[in-house]
Amino acid sequence: MKIKFDQNMDPRGATILKQAGHEVLTVKEQNLIGAEDEVIAKVCQDESRCLVTLDLDFANTILYPPQNYFGLVVLRHPKPTAKSLLELVRQFSAALQSLDPTQKLWIVEPGRIRVRE
């Protein structure tokens, strides 16, 4: 799967996904740090990439209707630490083996993934 890692994501998470066979680009690698959410969303559409982020704005289905994207994935943890967020990336990676986030919003939380279409 083609994935875009937002600027608020630990780059070690991108490595986890790359090792699982996914094609991952980061916002930093594309010199998009500081870009507005709308710009990031448009780049993801243009590149057919699923966005992985901590930014709750992307969970707003009115602003970002999931059917218009190749996947919007928001990681949520009640006590976010680098370690706990990397665990959520691993959980997301495992889910990709059997599920497809295309045209969906996934909220990845410890032990579950909420899906909105």
What name fits each language-model region?
Residues 94-117:
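Charged phosphate-binding loop/patch that engages nucleotide di/tri-phosphates or the phosphate backbone
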Residues 26, 53, 74-76, 107, ...:
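Structural signal for conserved beta-strand scaffold positions within catalytic alpha/beta enzyme cores
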Residues 1-2, 117:
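Absolute protein N-terminus
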Residues 33-34, 54, 59-61:
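Short secondary-structure capping/turn micro-motifs that flank functional sites
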Residues 59-92:
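Mid-chain, well-packed structural core segment of small domains
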Residues 2-50:
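N-terminal first-folded block
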Residues 7, 54-56, 77:
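Short secondary-structure boundary segments
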